[in-house]
Amino acid sequence: MHILQTSPEKVELRSSESFCTLAYTLTFEGKRRTPCALIIKEASITADFGPLGTIEDRLLDRGNLLVLTRSWNLRQQGSYRLQVAFSYDDQELENKLFIPALWYQDNNKGKGCFPSAERSANWSFLETRMSIPCCAQLSNGQRLFTCASEPATDQRFVASVAPDRHGLIISIPGSEWPYSYQGKQSLVDTSSLALPCLEVPSQGLSYTRTFYLSNQKAGSSLEGYCQFVQQLSELSPKDKTEGIGWEHWFEYKLTRLINLVQNDGNGLAYLLMGEGNGEVQDVYAFTSASFLVKSLQGAQELASLTKYQPKTKALAAARANLATKFSLVDNHLLLAEVAKRIGDFFLQAERSEGVFQDNYDLVNDIWGGYLGIGEHPEFKSMVNSRCNGEAMKQYVLLARTLQKSGMEELSYLSLARRVARFYCEAQLSSGSFGRWWTEKGKPGDIQGTNGAYIGSFFCTLIPLLSDEDPLKADLLSAVHQAYSFYSELAYEGAFYGDTLDADSCDKEAGVALLSFFLDLYDLEHDKRLLESAKLAAQFIVQWIWQFDSFLPPGSELGQRNFRTRGMTSVSVAHHHLDFYGMAIAYEFLRYAHWTGDMFYQEQAKLMIEACRQLVATETDQLGRDETYIGWQPEQLNHTTWEYFNRTHAMQGYYDIDIAWVTVLTLGSYQLILEKFPSMLEE
């Protein structure tokens, strides 16, 4: 790497062509200062600011990655802002901005008060908002220019990143402008606030931080980002996450699942959506077969584990309480019997033939398509493709599992057939299974990826049908048409609108498509499906935390030494972490197995390890009582954001017991244990 001074405050880094330009400035007492001299050596640059001090850069060329270690040596007392400014030769072409887990295609799809290009052309975001600190990428159709930083370890040095005309600027201390997004309904105007400063004492201050730069020939933005992550992973620390052992993890998760089962008063059962959530518990007063509760998947897990013998007192007690709750014998069929009662409960959700509304309001005795928090309450009386796809897939699996315990349950398969017929007839000419449908099979909303769950459901049902069954041919035709549509979404990068409690670009859109493509590949082994799956997998990587982000040491998460590495964030609308990574890990392992691309196996391992954290045990119930053993919080608020706009619950706070976390993580664990057991070795 050659270093050329191009102005009194700038140097250009070159190899065979221009790599980037570095600008050296300091802000002292509100005024921008430039160096009086730049001292350039073979692999270092020193900017001399006279009595203020120096900035010293050491450069390390690691192939396609440049590692820049910067030391600020500040000698004069006062207020400072530190800037790290990178730019590249963009040939005056328009740059598109990408920030992992935060800014995708200008965030212009959806509804909500989250940051977008429509609200402002320029933004600055704190490093704690993105899955790699201060990571941002500019693409101009010819090059991909990316920067990132190691995480801050002190609140004073938490940085922010903002795009510039030809580059990116990292500032310390960080600030968010022109707005700070702090909750689903909270976008705080910060345009009139003074920028924060670093107060340097009379004895001076030295501070060192490492930055990472990449300048790639343009492939796709997401492909370039994945390459950047792969290069960075070779340099990042490999500290293991502190979590409980898998045997106890499994027992406690099953304990929580059993304790969520409720008797409906008529001998049937459902899963409680969540409990003990204080001031926001009213939000959780419904159950469902799918999505936020996943009662039917929970039933499938119970049925599959009916012969499992407990090793902990907590699990034994949960089984005994369950038997008492339903006046059953605590034997090897207990969990299967209760699973059947859950399945039977949701047979009531069929409003007319093949029209399935699986959300049930426990207070008002109302069935609906989706009754939770969302941006579109007008859809509650319709049926949703995601909910139907999830529920029917689990009905098929539950019927097969109960059969192994001697329980023939043809009503579940009959219902699945009727719902399948509904979607075969409703499927749009494009191949889409839509999003929201009226009871008459008319589309209410066709945007997003919800219909991919119908594709996965069909892939689960098809192997059970005989070749003489006319439904089989119809389903095969439908999934092929659906693949044409959803593969085009993946090609266009249109990963949008999958979660029902938000309306934005979200990671679950990528997971839905990846799962469908892999399910269809498992059925037919068409290599084209793996190409489409790669596009979805690349999109998902941005939501996986690659570093341990800064957490205030005195916060709940900080006190528990919680690590963000391997955790996943939700969407551009929901800036919190969750444990969805167990489900993603299984899909990544399938993809890696079929393609040999071990990058995705490595990413899967990160997520699996992260999901061992923060599970309530017999000795630590995470602030609750022993009836919550096995609960794991849904929302981990690592940054300045909270779902319900509660300012006290930001930056290191965890909260919300909700059934989907228990069900999804336990079910994914079972799949990984069956198919990829080596990934669970401790």
Regions found by a protein language model. Give the residues of each.
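Well-ordered alpha-helical scaffold segments within catalytic/enzyme domains
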Residues: 296-315, 319-333, 379, 390-408, ...
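Carbohydrate-recognition beta-sandwich/jelly-roll modules
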Residues: 2-392, 396-422
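Long alpha-helical HEAT/HEAT-like repeat alpha-solenoid scaffolds in very large eukaryotic proteins
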Residues: 516, 530-594
